[in-house]
Amino acid sequence: MNPLIQSLTEGQLRSDIPNFRPGDTVRVHAKVVEGTRERIQIFEGVVISRKGQGISEMYTVRKISGGIGVERTFPIHTPRVDKIEVVRHGKVRRAKLYYLRALQGKAARIKEIRR
């Protein structure tokens, strides 16, 4: 990587990111701007993927809201996310959990592991 680009991105990397993987349930505190007001919106769900590396790393969180699946993709190092809390760790054998989109109810549960 170009040394100039590398030096610019190192200053923007966040150090307060917890260790989480696909299958973990996380609570994301995202900043939402509505007009002139800014508030924190909590989005809690299962991490179904992580992709990329460095400043461009992203993760996708899926939750069921009103019987409908909702997915949001967040950059890991964005200032729009106030904090990320890991609620529980899940035991999965895949890096991408896109198969959860087709499952409903108890079939979509992920076994919890103690870390």
From Swiss-Prot:
Cellular component annotations (GO), alphabetically ordered: cytosolic large ribosomal subunit
Molecular-function annotations in GO: structural constituent of ribosome
Annotated keywords: Ribonucleoprotein, Ribosomal protein
Organism superkingdom: Bacteria
Ribonucleoprotein in keyword set: yes
GO biological process: translation
Pfam families membership: Ribosomal_L19 (PF01245)
Role of this protein: This protein is located at the 30S-50S ribosomal subunit interface and may play a role in the structure and function of the aminoacyl-tRNA binding site.
Family classification: Belongs to the bacterial ribosomal protein bL19 family.
Protein name: Large ribosomal subunit protein bL19
Lineage, opening ranks: Bacteria, Bacillati, Bacillota, Bacilli, Lactobacillales
